[in-house]
Amino acid sequence: MVTRQGPLHASTKQQGDAAETRALAWLQARGLRLEERNYRVARGPHARGGEIDLVMRAADGTLVFVEVRQRRGSGHGGAAASVGGVKQQRLLHAAQHYLQRYATPPPCRFDVLALDGDGIEWLQAAFDASS
């Protein structure tokens, strides 16, 4: 099997990292401050794993858990539609774990930053813990 790597054929991880870097710069330009990138919770024998792409802090103190999704086009609903129930549950699990570091957790929300081609769509409060 032949695999192609290089500038024209970036790996899925490289593409994801580039999308997260683009999303981070875009959010910072809108006043959000990075708290942590790629926060991971390991999968255990009785627990789901999870990862939060970006943990940001809004100017009002709200902790913003950001899922970055990239798609080349809007087929199958585009990037935003790819954050379904299972993915939301993994994000919620990781966020609950992250919030354990606070004696009094700050207000928080779950955003999706959808990169479809050259466009960026910011879905603030895309879902909540009751979803």
Predicted regions and their residues:
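Acidic-basic catalytic patches of nuclease active cores, encompassing PD-(D/E)XK
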Residues: M1-V41
